[in-house]
UniProtKB/Swiss-Prot annotation:
<protein>
    <recommendedName>
        <fullName>Snaclec A9</fullName>
    </recommendedName>
</protein>
<feature type="domain" description="C-type lectin">
    <location>
        <begin position="11"/>
        <end position="132"/>
    </location>
</feature>
<feature type="disulfide bond">
    <location>
        <begin position="4"/>
        <end position="15"/>
    </location>
</feature>
<keyword id="KW-1015">Disulfide bond</keyword>
<dbReference type="GO" id="GO:0090729">
    <property type="term" value="F:toxin activity"/>
</dbReference>
<keyword id="KW-0800">Toxin</keyword>
<dbReference type="GO" id="GO:0005576">
    <property type="term" value="C:extracellular region"/>
</dbReference>
<dbReference type="InterPro" id="IPR018378">
    <property type="entry name" value="C-type_lectin_CS"/>
</dbReference>
<feature type="disulfide bond">
    <location>
        <begin position="106"/>
        <end position="123"/>
    </location>
</feature>
<dbReference type="InterPro" id="IPR050111">
    <property type="entry name" value="C-type_lectin/snaclec_domain"/>
</dbReference>
<comment type="subunit">
    <text>Heterodimer; disulfide-linked.</text>
</comment>
<feature type="disulfide bond">
    <location>
        <begin position="32"/>
        <end position="131"/>
    </location>
</feature>
<dbReference type="InterPro" id="IPR001304">
    <property type="entry name" value="C-type_lectin-like"/>
</dbReference>
<keyword id="KW-0964">Secreted</keyword>
<comment type="similarity">
    <text>Belongs to the snaclec family.</text>
</comment>
<dbReference type="Pfam" id="PF00059">
    <property type="entry name" value="Lectin_C"/>
</dbReference>
<dbReference type="InterPro" id="IPR016186">
    <property type="entry name" value="C-type_lectin-like/link_sf"/>
</dbReference>
Length: 133
């Protein structure tokens, strides 16, 4: 689609791909940056984009596990566990849809909410992830 690499999906000027690999948040972000110059874990800037990403994840992750989460490019950066004011790609947060704030610092999408709500997760846990370029 529209100048995306093979296997990537186009939406409003960006390309997206769900990876069925288990990585920590940090390793997933690093992996995404290695896919292309502008690659990062997905940043979700609107409800429409959230729906697109949720559908993409649902289509690409068929088998279920006890814990089904998918990393997005958001994590708390300071010691007080508040969320950082930007996505991992540097864009500002102007759309939010998380469940409840906990002490866990990285955010992911949860299968139980059909990948539409954001949940706080332990950054060191390996989960699958979505990259955006």
């Amino acid at each position: 689609d529209q100048d995306c690499l093979p296997g990537w999906s186009f939406y409003e000027g960006h390309c997206y791909k769900v990876f069925n690999l288990d990585k920590t948040w940090e390793d997933a972000e690093k992996f995404c940056t290695e896919q292309a110059n502008s690659g990062h874990l997905v940043s979700i800037d609107s409800k429409k984009e959230a729906n697109f990403v949720a559908e993409l994840v649902s289509q690409n992750i068929k088998e279920t596990r006890r814990t089904d989460f998918v990393w997005i490019g958001l994590r708390a950066e300071d010691k007080r566990q508040h969320c950082s004011s930007e996505w991992s790609d540097g864009s500002s947060i102007n759309y939010q849809n998380w469940i409840e704030a906990e002490s866990k610092k990285c955010l992911g999408l949860e299968k139980q909410t059909r990948y539409r709500k954001w949940v706080n997760l332990n950054c060191g846990q390996p989960y699958r992830f979505t990259c955006e370029i």
